[in-house]
């Protein structure tokens, strides 16, 4: 496969990278500036959950905007043209919803009281938000079952298997060391955030290995 990119594809890749970096940095800075006074974001587990939540929400929002406005989406999503977005809208919409729900759930759990800070959400409120997001994730997953073709299903299966191997290696090894007293066991929220980030990393690895991250 010829991986050499022409001028327009190179410009599109640069635009995607720069736009993603700027938007991600701006959203993260704004969030940390406004949430650090209420939530204990010096806790590594909470900070990891916030980072994972922001990443998932931004991914979902970008895909959702692209699905709603195909003309604009064709400029920053990795598609041939707006017509492809229209054709794939049935897959893009539920995928965007899943990402946003997962991100909201992680952020809600991270913003509960901790340390000497009251938290932006009470534990009860965060529990309700997390439960609602989880229920919606189940519904969205069932909704997506009939909308995913065999190729995308194989990508999902492969990335899920890789994420399982990575999480077993990382958290299994960590658990063994914690049992022996060499390290402290990871906080539950850190475990959830770590699993979410590993799934994301596995997904990018799988689609990248298939050449699907190259600008089109």
Task: Report residues per predicted region.
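Membrane-helix boundary/juxtamembrane motif in polytopic membrane proteins
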Residues: 147-165
